[in-house]
């Protein structure tokens, strides 16, 4: 599981940073990629990665500001330029309005897609679980921005325990079909009458990863709830230390507020994005340094950077 950042800037593209989008790469887990937000130029950034558009199975939108959705019609259109056998449906999750935005854009531009879009709109005031599969659950909760906006909590379900192959061999179990039966939880009896209890050779289930991805927001309790004990928290840092008043006025957070959320939630790692174009390279290191006085495991991400989870 990896997160690759396709756009880490705030408001408008800059030479160094595109606007908001990231890919949660679940290729090893379910052979899919999930996008979170799709700002202008997202498909251009994807061309600079190994991500195949047909692998993008789900798109989660945090809110309907342009820097988070203006790349969506173009990406959906370009995704259709694949061979017919590669066409797969796509699911789009987001606040009420995302469906009308996408359909109006496609209609006005005369775009016809050879695959289906399944929309999952929700009211941000009542949203909760938005997706459950056999391996993942996704929750959303309303944040505190200038328009309806949510954050997402992606929970990987517990992973199967691992088979202790060395112990099995020591117990006289020949490598082959019996290993498979034991891994599936079946007890087996060897030719000499020895009974092998499967549970004795399988480790307990391992907890899956928890990834929290927030949209634009002021510091709020919902951010902490979404991030409790997460392995990774992706949080905006549009403003820097001392800019709390202007950040609140415009519905955003400072690096210091993001760090406090991470500390309060007990996350393992904080990744800061949605960086204002006014911050130069020398300012970025100071943003990280200031935030680290509150939460040490903090990193300011760059476009195309990939984080292994």
UniProtKB/Swiss-Prot annotation:
UniProt-recorded Gene Ontology molecular function terms: 3'-tRNA processing endoribonuclease activity; zinc ion binding
UniProt record similarity statement: Belongs to the RNase Z family.
Keyword Metal-binding: yes
Provenance organism: Streptococcus suis (strain 05ZYH33)
Keywords recorded for this protein, A-Z: Endonuclease, Hydrolase, Metal-binding, Nuclease, tRNA processing, Zinc
Cofactor note text: Binds 2 Zn(2+) ions.
Active site: residue positions: 67
Protein's UniProt keywords contain Flavoprotein: no
Origin: domain of life: Bacteria
Database matches in InterPro entries: Metallo-B-lactamas, RibonucZ/Hydroxyglut_hydro, RNase_Z/BN
Enzyme's top EC category: hydrolase
Name this polypeptide is given: Ribonuclease Z
Residues noted as binding Zn(2+) 2 in the record, renumbered to the chain: 67-68, 216, 274
Cofactor(s) recorded in Swiss-Prot or TrEMBL: Zn(2+)
Catalysed reactions, as listed in the record: Endonucleolytic cleavage of RNA, removing extra 3' nucleotides from tRNA precursor, generating 3' termini of tRNAs. A 3'-hydroxy group is left at the tRNA terminus and a 5'-phosphoryl group is left at the trailer molecule
Residues annotated to bind Zn(2+) 1: 63, 65, 145, 216
EC number from the UniProt entry: 3.1.26.11
Function according to Swiss-Prot or TrEMBL: Zinc phosphodiesterase, which displays some tRNA 3'-processing endonuclease activity. Probably involved in tRNA maturation, by removing a 3'-trailer from precursor tRNA.
Oligomer status and interactors: Homodimer.
